[in-house]
A protein has these predicted regions:
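Gly/Ser/Thr-rich phosphate-binding loop
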Residues: 2-10, 19-83, 96
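Acidic/polar alpha-helix N-cap and adjacent early helical turns
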Residues: 262-276
Length: 276
């Protein structure tokens, strides 16, 4: 605003907080042109709002991890808004990115989800004095295994669908939290949403949605379920809906999704609901 900055970088939670700041409309952001969205998968609706409301028409997505220095893929400013909002772009030049089947370590064909893996000049030599940890993440072919689930399309663009450990398995059905999150973000009352698995003695896991409501808005559990009904598969509709003020975060602003299961169990216990 004051310095007339032209670029803005951050993780999705930062952009979401900025977009929903009560004084957002008081700032002149028209000098913004570009930026980088990275650090965590970005909701499609958030990316579109950053382009439209924050004037970052040339913002791109970058995907990677610290062990990859820290990038593997990136979209381009010349890509369409839809591509930049829904994918993390293509592999960096001179870097090999593959989607590998976690069970067989074989490359998945386009359109088939698997683990995002990378090989190239950007990959670390290893963890300092920890060969066991290094061997656990870099395979014998030199590919770094990210632990992230992704899919590549016919044009070489990658889309992140979640974390392998965060995938919910309900009665044998694989459920990707990000798919449900992207759908729920379309509800105008929702500022932020995170989806995680809640233990279930019958199905193994049930879908839990942790929703932060926009200031001045109201929302009920039934309204959320009605919004989902007929739009997504029944088994993907959250059984448990929690309205929260925030999420467990790292110092760098990333959401600690792995802690949400315990948060959900605690909130259910407070309601007198025992699930395990």
């Amino acid at each position: 605003h004051r310095e007339r900055c032209t670029a803005l970088h951050g993780v999705p939670t930062m952009f979401i907080a900025e977009l929903n700041h009560p004084m957002f409309d008081m700032f002149d952001l028209s000098s913004l042109r570009t930026g980088i969205m990275a650090g965590a998968p970005c909701p499609i609706e958030t990316m579109k709002q950053v382009m439209d409301k924050m004037y970052c028409k040339e913002i791109i997505s970058v995907y990677g991890l610290t062990e990859a220095s820290p990038g593997m893929t990136a979209s381009r400013v010349t890509d369409s808004m839809e591509i930049r909002a829904t994918t993390v772009g293509c592999a960096f030049p001179n870097v090999e990115v593959k989607v590998l089947d976690p069970a067989t370590n074989k490359e998945c064909p386009p359109g088939t989800p698997g683990e995002m893996c990378c090989k190239g000049y950007n990959i670390m030599k290893g963890y300092y004095k920890n060969p066991e940890a290094t061997a656990a993440i870099i395979d014998e072919n030199g590919f770094l295994h990210s632990g992230d689930l992704g899919v590549m399309d016919e044009n070489g663009y990658f889309r992140i669908t979640g974390r392998i450990k965060e995938m919910i398995i309900r009665g044998g059905e694989n459920i990707y939290p990000r798919e449900i999150e992207n759908f729920l973000y379309k509800m105008p009352q929702i500022e932020a949403v995170e989806v995680a698995g809640i233990p279930s003695p019958k199905y193994g896991e049930e879908v839990g949605a942790f929703i932060k409501i926009k200031e001045g808005s109201s929302l009920t559990e039934e309204e959320v379920r009605l919004y989902c009904r007929g739009q997504i598969a029944r088994y993907k509709i959250p059984k448990y809906i929690f309205f929260v003020d925030g999420y467990p975060m790292t110092a760098s602003g990333k959401i600690q999704k792995y802690k949400l299961k315990d948060v959900g169990l605690r909130l259910l216990k407070e309601k007198g609901v025992e699930v395990i």
